[in-house]
Amino acid sequence: MNLWAWVGMLGIILFTLLPFIEKKKRTREEIQKAIVTVGIVLGIILAVLLFDINYLVAVLFGFLAMILFDRKTYTKKRLIIYIPIALILSYLTYALLRNNPNYVLEHLKEHPENSSFYFAENGEVTVAYESDIKRPLASTVKILIALEYAMQVEENQLQKDMLVSLDDLSKFYLKNSDGGAHESWLEVMKQNNKIKDNQVTLHDVAKGMITYSSNANTDYLMHLLGVEAINARKNQLGLNQHDDVYPIVSALYISDVVKTDEMSDEELIHELEALSFDEYSTIAHQLSQKMQTGEFDLSEETLELSSKLQKVWSDRLIGASANDYGKILQLISHDQLPTDAAKTIRDLMEWPMQLNKDNKEHYLHLGSKGGSTMFVLNNAMYVEDLKGNQFEIVYLLDELNPLESFLIRKNRNSFEAKLINDVDFRKEVIQELTQ
């Protein structure tokens, strides 16, 4: 729930209870109405926070509940009005919430200009749908950073048990910039008693980057590993469409650097879009350096970007092709990395096996890293089933509207599972995306 959702819900409660300041309004009927209204609002909040129900869907059910609990609903006139509305809303709710793996396939087919899909089975690439097109990676780029970390551990440049101060990580922490990922990681570290003297191990920092997608951990690792080393590694691997990497958190403030007092939002957007990649990434590097030295203190900062500025930021994220990440996944999945590096990267990537024990009943290996913004939804995953069959899946989806994003998030797990486990569905996907 965002700020406006909280304001709306709390506002309903406030205006429901406000009339009871007057004693004459405290009738039994009005009190019952208030209890129902407040109960429904609290139910909406709990559904969103505890059960991860989409806010709009929860509000829709709340609206239906209010109609059902209103005695006036059950007059003949109102029933004639409400029954068709209820049927329409029920159908729309079913369409939104039903499990529909085909939705992802249909979206790919209908939006080739904004979608890439890569699929390989036992080392053979069977789908390369717009897979050579560079698209924004969002947090999927963290796979490359994890790979460089694993290689530097292999080469004895770094030690996994090296201690890292949480103060050093906090230099790159901007509140509300990663969907609560960094806070979630810290909470788990505390629960598992892994914080000693305000320090954690380097390997746990890397796990926080992949498992929880902490942006602060990511930028810390970029500085530690060296951006030059990360970029050299991607070139060595032949990731031909992959941009050079630059810090993630500092890029959020590029608009503040470019903006002048006289500049309108439209002019600012024009200036940001006019920056070359080198100019844009240079500003990000300079800001990140100031964060590391403490010259730019994020502890007092808040982030407020309009949706239009978020779109520019999203479009200018580090980009690569689905082929690039298919190549990285094959290196990991087919054990083409040095022994220690392979062990390290698998330990990072295979968090779904560690957090969800049920996966062990179906797979020998399952590694995954996604990435998203308001407009982007990506995933890169490798799987080895109990029979030894190996699969690599990469999809990069851009220019999503809120409904598309919601439906893909809702159905992508079932799409991935069906693609891996259902031979007929796999054949259908291959046929539809290779015509």
Set out the residue ranges of the language-model regions.
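Structured C-terminal helix/loop/strand segments within mature extracytoplasmic catalytic/sensor domains
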Residues: 10-84, 96-104, 111, 300-435
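Mid-domain, small-residue-enriched loop/turn segments at the edges of structured enzyme/sensor domains
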Residues: 206-329
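Sec-dependent N-terminal signal peptides of Gram-positive bacterial secreted proteins and lipoproteins
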Residues: 84-92
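Bimodal feature
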Residues: 109-112, 152-155, 160-164, 198, ...
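Hydrophobic transmembrane alpha-helical segments in integral membrane proteins
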Residues: 1-13
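Active-site-adjacent loops and short helices of periplasmic peptidoglycan-processing enzymes
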Residues: 91-144, 148-258
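Carbohydrate-binding/catalytic loop surfaces
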Residues: 186-193, 260-266, 367-368, 375
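Juxtamembrane/transmembrane-helix boundary motifs in multi-pass membrane proteins
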Residues: 1-2, 28, 74, 195, ...
